[in-house]
């Protein structure tokens, strides 16, 4: 009996000592932890939560911007694909050589397309007159020639009525073809486009590349070579031209507007037009040049031009929505 009581007391003592030791250990750990604890008042907590919210808002904004950027990129890819399909469909109707270029000048879209079945320059017809006008104002600003009322009137007639006599007088004032070709070289850096003879005269064809026509439209929209005032004069002369109702601008929807300079020589199968078109907050340039194998019959090419202007404009409009 005594042995049993001893064992009982001994066992309880062990339990007590173990509990006591654990208590001491726990107290030490708690004190050590407490020395590292930072206590915050309400003001500190407000700052912490404010910083936390700020970081989360910044992360959310970054995620949103990235998502928006991807969405815009997808929209832009879709627009480029749609315009590419339009060009392919319309130019498949043309029996001959062609070049087509489209480029965003202003707005959220990013279109810069060039379709062609020939790398050779094409006869320019009257589209060369845009370059003659730019050259005239460049030389006026340089002081090489004087801006007389007669010259200003001829530049306007050259662009608005496509008057060949007025054009040839402007060429004479400039001193000949080389002056215009120097301006073209400054604009484009290449020799794809060139003035080789007076308008409606015999001789070597005046030549153009639609990429250069787009560059000319860029110069009118955001002038670098000539002043904004003179660029505006050219654009005003390209408003309500005598071909507005027959080519790229003919079937423009009511929500769009544009200016243009066309060229044609139906008895040689030549049909061309270049335009700047506004739709919503978008402004784009569109240039088409064709030299067909059907002389004296340009009805099909005129229809292609009208369709192209209308359908490409509608594509940009859908992008805007």
What are these regions (language model features)?
Residues 6-19, 23, 27-94, 224-242, ...:
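Structured C-terminal helix/loop/strand segments within mature extracytoplasmic catalytic/sensor domains
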Residues 134-142, 215-222, 310-318:
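Short glycine/serine- and small hydrophobic-enriched flexible loop segments
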Residues 103-105, 158-162, 170-174, 196-198, ...:
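Active-site-proximal beta-strand/loop segments in catalytic clefts of secreted hydrolases
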Residues 206-262, 266:
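A conserved catalytic-loop motif detector
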């Amino acid at each position: 009996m005594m042995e049993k009581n001893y064992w009982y007391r001994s066992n309880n003592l062990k339990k007590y000592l173990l509990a006591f030791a654990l208590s001491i250990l726990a107290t030490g750990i708690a004190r050590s932890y407490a020395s590292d604890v930072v206590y915050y008042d309400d003001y500190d907590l407000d700052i912490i939560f404010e910083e936390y919210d700020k970081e989360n808002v910044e992360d959310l904004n970054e995620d949103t911007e990235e998502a928006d950027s991807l969405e815009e990129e997808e929209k832009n890819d879709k627009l480029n694909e749609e315009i590419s399909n339009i060009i392919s469909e319309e130019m498949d109707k043309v029996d001959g050589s062609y070049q087509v270029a489209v480029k965003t000048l202003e707005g959220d879209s990013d279109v810069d397309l060039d379709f062609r079945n020939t790398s050779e320059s094409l006869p320019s017809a009257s589209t060369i007159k845009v370059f003659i006008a730019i050259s005239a104002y460049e030389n006026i600003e340089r002081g090489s020639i004087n801006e007389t009322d007669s010259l200003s009137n001829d530049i306007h007639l050259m662009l608005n009525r496509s008057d060949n006599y007025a054009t040839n007088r402007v060429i004479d004032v400039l001193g000949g073809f080389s002056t215009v070709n120097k301006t073209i070289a400054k604009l484009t850096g290449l020799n794809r486009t060139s003035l080789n003879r007076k308008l409606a005269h015999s001789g070597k064809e005046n030549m153009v590349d639609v990429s250069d026509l787009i560059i000319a439209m860029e110069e009118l929209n955001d002038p670098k070579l000539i002043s904004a005032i003179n660029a505006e004069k050219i654009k005003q002369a390209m408003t309500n031209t005598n071909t507005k109702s027959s080519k790229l601008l003919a079937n423009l929807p009511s929500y769009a507007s544009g200016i243009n300079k066309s060229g044609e020589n139906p008895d040689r199968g030549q049909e061309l037009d270049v335009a700047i078109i506004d739709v919503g907050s978008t402004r784009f340039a569109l240039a088409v040049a064709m030299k067909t194998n059907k002389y004296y019959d340009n009805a099909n090419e005129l229809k292609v031009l009208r369709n192209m202007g209308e359908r490409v404009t509608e594509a940009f409009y859908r992008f805007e929505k």
